[in-house]
A protein has these predicted regions:
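Mobile, glycine/GP-rich and aromatic-enriched active-site lid/loop segments adjacent to catalytic centers
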Residues: 1-59, 132-252
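Aromatic-residue detector
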Residues: 43, 48, 55-56, 70, ...
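A conserved FAD-binding loop/helix module that cradles the flavin
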Residues: 53-78
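Short, surface-exposed, charged/polar-biased interaction segments
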Residues: 65-68, 85, 92, 192
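Long, amphipathic alpha-helical stalk/connector segments used for oligomerization, subunit docking
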Residues: 82-162
Length: 252
């Protein structure tokens, strides 16, 4: 083992026992969940951060399992085991949504589709500006692109097959999600948010570069305060809105 690797494991307290015993200490959930991410309260599912199984400092595989796999398995269980009477107004809301998506399919049908290229572009752009390295200027610029693409979605996105039509719906969901995340990131830095364990936010005015040869994007300042407020975001009338509120006290 390389000395650097041994030093890292030693400082992390990972040089003991068997691999299973060591892994059992990583990201232990604060809430008991089963293999379907259901808590000991029947019908209540806690996934990812809600179960404290997806923290700021985490290995990538754990994050994937906690977030994407956990939510998928919870949805599968709910669809198969938690059937019941629909709440009041569900049929009307579902009918309206189905009609909207059927109309979208009619408008976006074409002999040759472009949804794959648009999907690739959206994925690459989000990875470029909204992953671990976040430049506020790039986030704002791509956020405007996302807004424009959603506004002109029916006119600009085309599907040439059933497979591409499925991708078209996923692309729409992807862009809506990107709009929410980009709005939250922009609002975070606008309220003085700095770099933390999960992301480096470019700060060209009050930040420093750890190494001079790095691009200016790596200029940052650490968030050394504990913000008592929680950022909230919701979708209303086609717009992502944000607000900050005090944290709710812990029960008990």
């Amino acid at each position: 083992m390389l000395p650097e690797a041994r030093e890292y494991l030693t400082r992390a307290g990972a040089c003991f026992g068997t691999p299973i015993e060591r892994l059992a200490q990583m990201n232990q959930p604060a809430i008991g969940i089963d293999c379907w991410w259901q808590t000991n309260v029947k019908g209540l599912f806690a996934v990812s951060e809600a179960a404290a199984s997806h923290g700021v400092y985490r290995p990538g595989g754990t994050a994937l399992n906690a977030g994407q796999v956990g939510s998928t398995r919870a949805a599968q269980y709910i669809a198969a085991r938690c059937r019941g009477d629909a709440s009041a107004g569900f049929d009307a809301a579902a009918s309206a949504a189905l009609a909207e998506m059927a109309a979208l399919a009619d408008v976006c049908r074409a002999d040759t589709g472009n949804v794959r290229a648009l999907w690739q572009h959206a994925a690459e752009e989000m990875s470029r500006c909204g992953a671990a390295i976040r430049d506020p200027a790039q986030i704002r610029a791509y956020g405007k692109q996302v807004e424009a693409q959603l506004a002109d979605f029916a006119q600009t996105v085309k599907a040439g097959s059933r497979t591409e039509l499925a991708m078209l719906y996923h692309l729409r969901d992807m862009l809506l999600s990107q709009r929410a995340y980009l709005t939250a990131m922009t609002d975070y830095t606008a309220h003085g948010g700095k770099s933390r364990g999960s992301a480096l936010h470019t700060d060209l005015t009050g930040g420093v570069k750890p190494f001079g040869q790095l691009p200016d994007t790596f200029t940052f300042a650490l968030d050394e305060t504990e913000n008592p407020l929680v950022q909230e975001l919701w979708y209303e009338d086609g717009v992502c809105r944000t607000a900050w509120r005090a944290r709710a006290p812990s029960p008990g």
